[in-house]
């Protein structure tokens, strides 16, 4: 199977030749590590701050890594005193919806309070540009589809509320301090680096495409489909998947807009086309040539039937396009990464500690 790669260019109104030193918070994680590669390709100087609670030091292949928490005010003071950052990209957060319901204080502390500490350091050192990783979970249950930026934000879990609260704080910081930000609301991030250097290594894994491919490779006994009675053509939930490299391109364009003096803004990021759980499984079987073991379970509370993005505003204002986000391409890149992980584990069975931060790799089921 031929895998698609793509070279991106910014629209004419956004300059790309501005030298920059970027602080990437959470750069050892899934999306953050892909962003480091994109920024390095653009010639940026890079510093990553990550506590490695969910990220991996070996994913920080570009720039320097400072191991520590974004909630550590003393550490931030040292960092901002030592470096003159042009902007900050903030990827660090806890992202599991279920865990946010059972441990809301942990999520508000990590996602909201730690971001306040970061903003205080930025304000103290006159760093006034931030690209923030937000989420479609700020919208809650969809009132219409596809969902644009005008859709009411009514988050239904602490994870979504923590991100929504940060968005409100950022709007206030712009008005009070001139600290400009771009909030990027992902729908379903998926895929892996087209060149095979990076990919998903969540532990535990919660993203559907990665889980399906683990079932295809044999690292997982099966994939569980939660609910077959939704009001969709095949009865399973529909989601909008956007390639991680496309997300990084949106971050790059947002950064360039801020560096060029552009205003604060929020954008929805998605492919604009949804795929059902059953379609994802079928696509995985086509790409891998393997049968995916499937089990069926009841609906999960709070799962909407359909979540699809209207990303026209990002196209109009940033010139962004989801160029790699067709399901076949996403699946192909993710499968390439899954195969590379399996090969490493076959060559060195004890490599799971290094690859996955010491968590058990062979856990079966969901």
Predicted regions and their residues:
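C-terminal substrate-binding subdomain of Rossmann-fold SDR/epimerase-dehydratase oxidoreductases
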Residues: 211-366
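Glycosyltransferase donor-binding loop in the core domain
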Residues: 71, 92-95, 107, 204, ...
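Short-chain dehydrogenase/reductase
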Residues: 108, 156-164, 198, 202-210, ...
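N-terminal Rossmann-like NAD(P)+-binding domain of SDR-like oxidoreductases, especially those catalyzing
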Residues: 2-192, 366
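Short, flexible, glycine-rich and Lys/Arg-enriched loop motifs at helix boundaries
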Residues: 57, 187-208, 218-239
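Residue-level signature of the cytosolic catalytic core of signaling kinases
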Residues: 68, 201-205, 273, 323
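Short, contiguous clusters of charged residues that form electrostatic/catalytic patches at enzyme active sites
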Residues: 74, 78, 113-117, 164, ...
């Amino acid at each position: 199977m031929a895998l698609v790669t793509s070279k991106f260019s910014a629209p004419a109104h956004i300059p790309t030749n501005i030298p920059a030193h970027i602080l990437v918070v959470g750069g050892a994680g899934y999306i953050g590590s892909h962003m480091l590669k994109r920024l390095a390709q653009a010639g940026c100087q890079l510093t990553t701050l990550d506590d490695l609670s969910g990220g991996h030091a070996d994913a920080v292949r570009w720039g320097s890594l400072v191991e520590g928490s974004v909630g550590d005010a003393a550490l931030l003071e040292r960092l901002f005193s030592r470096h003159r950052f042009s902007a900050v990209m903030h990827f660090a957060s806890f992202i599991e919806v279920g865990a946010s319901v059972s441990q809301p204080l942990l999520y508000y502390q990590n996602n909201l309070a730690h971001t306040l500490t970061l903003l205080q350091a930025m304000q103290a050192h006159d760093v006034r540009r931030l690209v923030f990783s937000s989420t479609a979970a700020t919208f809650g249950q969809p009132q219409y589809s596809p969902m644009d930026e005008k859709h009411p934000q009514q988050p239904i879990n602490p994870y979504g509320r923590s991100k929504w609260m940060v968005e409100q704080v950022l709007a206030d910081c712009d008005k009070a301090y001139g600290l400009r930000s771009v909030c990027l609301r992902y729908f379903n991030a998926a895929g892996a680096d087209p060149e095979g250097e990076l990919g998903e290594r969540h532990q535990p894994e919660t993203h559907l495409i990665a889980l399906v491919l683990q079932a295809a490779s044999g690292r997982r006994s099966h994939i569980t489909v939660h609910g077959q009675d939704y009001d969709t053509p095949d009865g399973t939930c529909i989601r909008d998947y956007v390639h991680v490299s496309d997300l990084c391109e949106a971050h790059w364009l947002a950064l360039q807009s801020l560096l060029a003096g552009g205003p604060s803004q929020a954008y929805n990021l998605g492919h604009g086309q949804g795929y059902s759980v059953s379609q994802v499984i079928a696509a995985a079987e086509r790409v891998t040539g393997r049968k995916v073991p499937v089990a069926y379970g009841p609906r999960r509370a709070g799962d909407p039937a359909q979540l699809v993005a209207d990303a026209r505003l990002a196209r109009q204002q940033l010139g962004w396009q989801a160029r790699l986000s067709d399901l076949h391409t996403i699946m192909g890149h993710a499968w390439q990464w899954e195969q590379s992980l399996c090969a490493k584990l076959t060559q060195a069975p004890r490599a799971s500690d290094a690859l996955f931060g010491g968590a058990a790799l062979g856990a079966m089921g969901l």
